[in-house]
């Protein structure tokens, strides 16, 4: 069954080149692909990271964020991913969006101009009100942390 998204939110975008505008690859995609804004190819050696410009600035509405997430194909085929995933672009940020890619592979990875390098996912933000407390309600899990379930 095909569903169209009638509930969308307009994100005003300033961009160096219209071809760099983020886009959804399929009708049900949650993430919009974002491209590298490079004048020439850029090499990321094995074990190294690079800050990749997108040539794009956004006006995200108050009460929202955009999360920067990896593209699964880059991770699977080249062991390249977004270093601080998910990255958060706050609603009050107006600078250029840049993506930190890291090469976990054994071969150098070449980022080409216009290459799809990450995905942008719009999300609503609910802010927490942290309140100083004397104690916390107990749970079955308790203080069991990393690896406690096996």
Swiss-Prot record:
Protein name as catalogued: Deoxyuridine 5'-triphosphate nucleotidohydrolase
InterPro entries on file: dUTPase, dUTPase-like, dUTPase-like_sf, dUTPase_trimeric
Pfam families according to UniProt: dUTPase
Keyword Lipid biosynthesis: no
Entry keywords, A to Z: Hydrolase, Magnesium, Metal-binding, Nucleotide metabolism
Protein family according to the UniProt entry: Belongs to the dUTPase family.
CDD domains: trimeric_dUTPase (cd07557)
Enzyme Commission number(s): 3.6.1.23
Disulphide bridges: none
Function description: This enzyme is involved in nucleotide metabolism: it produces dUMP, the immediate precursor of thymidine nucleotides and it decreases the intracellular concentration of dUTP so that uracil cannot be incorporated into DNA.
Domain of life: Bacteria
Pathway in which the depicted protein is active: Pyrimidine metabolism; dUMP biosynthesis; dUMP from dCTP (dUTP route): step 2/2
Provenance organism: Protochlamydia amoebophila (strain UWE25)
Name of the gene: dut
Positions of substrate binding: 71-73, 84, 88-90, 98
BP GO terms, sorted: dUMP biosynthetic process; dUTP catabolic process
SUPFAM superfamilies tied to this protein: dUTPase-like
Cofactor(s), names only, from the UniProt record: Mg(2+)
GO MF term list: dUTP diphosphatase activity; magnesium ion binding
Reactions this protein catalyses: dUTP + H2O = dUMP + diphosphate + H(+)
Enzyme class: hydrolase
